[in-house]
């Protein structure tokens, strides 16, 4: 039986035996990268504003406060998207929710490109943020639910990498269009990729886990057969595992009220996201051309290509981190990352305070900036998202991850909405020293509060968590 969308079907034993003899390319290697387009758009939305902002400020004669809201409106929308994404996903499924986010991406990007005032642009950026918030919450869940166990980590890590690639792509677009001065083309450049995501989602499979949660087991089996190269044994085993896990799942908010350790793990996830944002990394991502100008790079084109170099280094560093996090561990990467980021922020703060009077001192400031973004991409950027999922029990994971995701976007908004004002009121040097102090504080918090989950199964983490073991000890 085929559904109208053509995405699922009921499979007879004869179908299974015939299809198992057919050699096929694993469909997961097609589905995964298409779903990761959501991460690419997420990254583009973060990165594209850095090159467009100086041109927008000139076109609309925008004050520092207006510029801050042009940047940070996206985060407010993303917080709303993260909240509503869970309801949409439960009601309509992961695939349809990603399709909806793609439509909102298209509308938001076109609206930004056609904005006739700074206030209209702020509104359109908020609409784009809703799409970012929905996709940032749903895409990793969708990927985890369609992936085979052996490649689940790689596909989810690939999603995180696609965010960094999206940032790099945005920086390249900004640099290429900087000569024309067309900020409208910069902001509208996301629309074609978002359109591809919308069209592609019509052809991708529905999450088998969601289908089973709606008591559509036959359709779930059909999807699993497609995803597992028609291996009926693997598909049936996975179907049974999903059925068992669904019996365990409960109401996350009810568990939050009743279980003190789950409340603590939820607050720890929220703290981790706060720490990630208040490293000051997104200050670099959003205002990179301005910071490079403060460091002594004079021309706009040079600043744009300097920003591209930052994007390249971040993408490479993230690739290294996601390939090594299971070998090195979570806490060592965070210790090193926060220490290096704190030292870099402190060094830049001192240099900006005493003044960059020579080419040598300007070069040191740029080197510190580069070291900072590499450290961030190899530590807090990927590790925090991994930990936020690992430290939550299965029957409260949706609730816990949703809370931490909203915290990420609210913290992101605060950072983006205050940076230019801080430069004006406190001065450049003091602002960077403030972020340095926060990074050094985060080292202490990692030591006191975080578990090391390297090599520990999710089942063991959950068993310790739900039995009341102190959070710091639920890992190794």
Predicted regions and their residues:
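Short intracellular "coupling" helices and adjacent cytoplasmic loop segments at the cytosolic face
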Residues: 226-237
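Short, structured interface segments
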Residues: 236-246
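Alpha-helical transmembrane bundle of multi-pass membrane proteins
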Residues: 2-218, 223-225, 244-476
């Amino acid at each position: 039986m085929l559904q109208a969308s053509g995405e699922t079907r009921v499979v007879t034993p004869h179908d299974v035996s015939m299809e198992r003899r057919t050699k096929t390319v694993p469909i997961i290697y097609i589905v995964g990268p298409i779903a990761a387009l959501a991460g690419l758009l997420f990254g583009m939305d973060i990165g594209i504003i850095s090159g467009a902002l100086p041109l927008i400020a000139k076109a609309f004669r925008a004050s520092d406060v207006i510029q801050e809201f042009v940047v940070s409106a996206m985060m407010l929308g993303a917080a709303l998207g993260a909240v509503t994404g869970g309801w949409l996903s439960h009601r309509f499924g992961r695939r349809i929710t990603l399709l909806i986010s793609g439509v909102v991406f298209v509308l938001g990007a076109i609206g930004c490109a056609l904005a006739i005032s700074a206030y209209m642009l702020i509104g359109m950026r908020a609409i784009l943020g809703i799409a970012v918030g929905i996709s940032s919450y749903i895409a990793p869940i969708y990927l985890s639910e369609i992936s085979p166990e052996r490649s689940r980590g790689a596909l989810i890590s690939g999603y995180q990498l696609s965010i960094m690639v999206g940032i790099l792509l945005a920086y390249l677009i900004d640099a290429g269009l900087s000569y024309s001065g067309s900020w409208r083309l910069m902001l509208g450049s996301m629309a074609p990729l978002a359109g591809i995501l919308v069209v592609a989602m019509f052809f991708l499979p529905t999450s088998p886990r969601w289908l089973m949660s709606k008591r559509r087991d036959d359709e779930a089996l059909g999807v699993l057969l497609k995803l597992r190269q028609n291996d009926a044994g693997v598909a049936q085993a996975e179907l049974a595992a999903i059925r068992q896990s669904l019996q365990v799942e409960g109401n996350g908010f009810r568990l939050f009220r009743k279980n003190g350790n789950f409340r603590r793990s939820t607050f720890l996830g929220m703290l981790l996201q706060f720490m990630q944002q208040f490293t000051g990394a997104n200050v670099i991502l959003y205002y990179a051309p301005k910071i490079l100008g403060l460091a002594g790079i004079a021309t706009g084109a040079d600043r744009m290509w300097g920003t591209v170099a930052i994007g390249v280094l971040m993408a490479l560093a993230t690739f290294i981190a996601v390939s090594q996090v299971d070998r090195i561990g979570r806490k060592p990467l965070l210790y090193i990352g926060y220490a290096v980021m704190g030292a870099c922020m402190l060094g830049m703060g001192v240099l900006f305070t005493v003044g960059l009077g020579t080419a040598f001192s300007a070069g040191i400031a740029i080197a510190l900036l580069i070291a900072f973004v590499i450290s961030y991409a190899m530590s807090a950027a990927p590790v925090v998202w991994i930990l936020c999922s690992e430290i939550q029990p299965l029957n409260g994971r949706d609730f816990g991850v949703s809370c931490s995701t909203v915290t990420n976007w609210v913290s992101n908004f605060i950072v983006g909405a205050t940076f230019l004002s801080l430069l004006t009121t406190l001065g450049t040097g003091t602002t960077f020293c403030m972020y340095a102090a926060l990074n050094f504080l985060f080292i202490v918090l990692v030591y006191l509060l975080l578990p090391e989950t390297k090599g520990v199964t999710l089942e063991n983490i959950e068993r310790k968590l739900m039995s009341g073991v102190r959070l710091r000890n639920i890992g190794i």
